[in-house]
Amino acid sequence: MLFRSAVNLRPNLINVVPNRAVFTVDLRNTDEAKLKDAEARVAAHIAEVAASERVGVEARSLARFEPVIFDAALVGRVEHHARALDLSTRRMPSGAGHDAQMMQRLCPTAMIFVPSVAGLSHNVKEHTEAADLVAGAQVLMNLMVELAEG
């Protein structure tokens, strides 16, 4: 289960007790049942804390998509083309709501990830070396040529 959150206090001042707090939660999992269970547990915990602290809570979903599994054959072809270039491969789940997640419902889909320095992703310090970007683009081009040639 991947979990990310943020808290925004209003007013956000050192010496003032806030009168409003906005808490966002981003839950991700490749297993729909586990995702639903986590959502229910978070909602129950928030309701319990709100009742014990006698505060009001408003909860709403900003976005919700069922997890998808990418096309196994296409993922295998991505791995084949990476290995042909002596590149390492690793299968990684991603619940970030990429376009590929939406397209998988319509057609076979896969994603190609390239390494970020220090593993930082979706972070202001994220950086990927040019050579890794070129390698990822080469894998994509080789796959596209293969698919175009049928």
Language-model-detected regions and their locations in the chain:
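Active-site-adjacent substrate-binding region
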Residues: 56, 60-115
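Short beta-strand/turn micro-motifs at beta-sheet edges
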Residues: 10-15
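His/Asp/Glu-rich mid-to-C-terminal helical/loop segments that flank catalytic regions of hydrolases
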Residues: 39-44, 114-150
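Generic non-transmembrane alpha-helical segments
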Residues: 41-53, 77-85, 139-147
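Solvent-exposed, non-transmembrane alpha-helical starts
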Residues: 34-38
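Short, small-residue-biased leader/transition segments that mark boundaries at the very start
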Residues: 1-2
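Short beta-alpha connecting loops at secondary-structure transitions
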Residues: 9, 28-32, 62-66, 119-131
